[in-house]
Amino acid sequence: MTAEEMKATESGAQSAPLPMEGVDISPKQDEGVLKVIKREGTGTEMPMIGDRVFVHYTGWLLDGTKFDSSLDRKDKFSFDLGKGEVIKAWDIAIATMKVGEVCHITCKPEYAYGSAGSPPKIPPNATLVFEVELFEFKGEDLTEEEDGGIIRRIQTRGEGYAKPNEGAIVEVALEGYYKDKLFDQRELRFEIGEGENLDLPYGLERAIQRMEKGEHSIVYLKPSYAFGSVGKEKFQIPPNAELKYELHLKSFEKAKESWEMNSEEKLEQSTIVKERGTVYFKEGKYKQALLQYKKIVSWLEYESSFSNEEAQKAQALRLASHLNLAMCHLKLQAFSAAIESCNKALELDSNNEKGLFRRGEAHLAVNDFELARADFQKVLQLYPNNKAAKTQLAVCQQRIRRQLAREKKLYANMFERLAEEENKAKAEASSGDHPTDTEMKEEQKSNTAGSQSQVETEA
């Protein structure tokens, strides 16, 4: 039964009582959720915890009274499975469906709205019947940018709510697949942030940080979150390869959070992490270096209990971290982020040579030539011997000249076209294709008189 057939079936009020029938799919086998498949779905895959699912549905009370339907709104309903966003019966039943499947779900009150009901349409202790059609489902996007680069599908939920943080020690079992071929199978204990040393993709560590103890998940990685344009020769992974990992987070020990460290510990850890970040940067592991420098900023930025001597050390570490973050962002071609990091550095030292120069580079990369020129000019004003700034300033001047030449040519062509159109209009007017000035004036007088008469009549 399609969504359209569902609509036809439920058009008009149903007054006949609905039967209690179906297979018991409730976890306790207490007949709290009964399911009848009305149309089989396709394929073998079913939604997993955290998947975004898209359905059409109609709901009735047991006496046949319809109380809701997505078909009436002509818009599919979507939610994240297993997250408690819908009644318990839905989280249970829709996890058993395949794409294209239509089923009837009968839900006892304890799996629906319970003793409270959902006034005014659903009374207390109501047993409900739904007809549901599953259209699609997709895994949970774990990226900040929501670009689909890290997709997780939870096979088994973990314990509690705690998750590994940056620097946590984790124990995992993993299997890596490229085009369904196993290329990596290991059990590891390592520190989050050090995974690249163990040939683990950046995106895999980010996924582990979103897992709970005991969780089993499947993680899909796009190339930019896997082994990128280089690939991984050790595993015979070619450039720009998409990967799949099956992960089991066995256990973890969280690293100390910023609020758990005193000022002395923060400075000590920041120095260690800065050195680690520098090593990563020199090895070309810019994403890993980025994480180290971000730690320093998070530890020191809002600390107010430093002594005068500690405050000076903290400021130097913060300045170096923002400058290094800017350099990492430049290498990763994240130019807006590079500008932001430079601005943070220049808030601490407004005449900082590296901050001004790197901001100029970022502005130049996004074709903001005037802003780039201003930064390079200031570098040379403060540091006249900076040869790189002289070179980049010359590049800016050249780009600005080219831009002005293009704009001049564009405007010249525009004015030329306008002149041609004006001459064409004059030629048509003189050939009698358009009314003469006298005719236009007479018509205008006539229209004005008519309008005035209409206004006076309406008034």
Swiss-Prot record:
Inhibited by FK506. The modification Phosphothreonine is found at T143, T436. GO terms for cellular component: axonal growth cone; cytoplasm; cytosol; extracellular exosome; microtubule; mitochondrion; neuronal cell body; nucleoplasm. Homodimer. Interacts with GLMN. Associates with HSP90AA1 and HSP70 in steroid hormone receptor complexes. Also interacts with peroxisomal phytanoyl-CoA alpha-hydroxylase (PHYH). Interacts with NR3C1 and dynein. Interacts with HSF1 in the HSP90 complex. Associates with tubulin. Interacts with MAPT/TAU. Interacts (via TPR domain) with S100A1, S100A2 and S100A6; the interaction is Ca(2+) dependent. Interaction with S100A1 and S100A2 (but not with S100A6) leads to inhibition of FKBP4-HSP90 interaction. Interacts with dynein; causes partially NR3C1 transport to the nucleus. The modification N-acetylthreonine is found at T2. Its EC number is 5.2.1.8. Residues 1-24, 421-459 are annotated as: Disordered. It holds the Pfam family FKBP_C. Immunophilin protein with PPIase and co-chaperone activities. Component of steroid receptors heterocomplexes through interaction with heat-shock protein 90 (HSP90). May play a role in the intracellular trafficking of heterooligomeric forms of steroid hormone receptors between cytoplasm and nuclear compartments. The isomerase activity controls neuronal growth cones via regulation of TRPC1 channel opening. Also acts as a regulator of microtubule dynamics by inhibiting MAPT/TAU ability to promote microtubule assembly. May have a protective role against oxidative stress in mitochondria. It comes from Homo sapiens (Human). Residues 446-459 have a biased composition (Polar residues). This is Peptidyl-prolyl cis-trans isomerase FKBP4. Residues 434-445 have a biased composition (Basic and acidic residues). The modification N6-acetyllysine is found at K282. The modification N-acetylmethionine is found at M1. TPR repeats lie at residues 270-303, 319-352, 353-386. PROSITE patterns: FKBP_PPIASE, TPR, TPR_REGION. The gene is FKBP4. Widely expressed. Residues 50-138, 167-253 form the PPIase FKBP-type domain. The modification Phosphoserine is found at S451, S453. The modification Phosphotyrosine is found at Y220. The keyword Kinase does not apply. GO terms for molecular function: ATP binding; copper-dependent protein binding; FK506 binding; GTP binding; heat shock protein binding; nuclear glucocorticoid receptor binding; peptidyl-prolyl cis-trans isomerase activity; phosphoprotein binding. Keywords: Acetylation, Cell projection, Chaperone, Cytoplasm, Cytoskeleton, Isomerase, Isopeptide bond, Methylation, Microtubule, Mitochondrion, Nucleus, Phosphoprotein, Repeat, Rotamase, TPR repeat, Ubl conjugation.
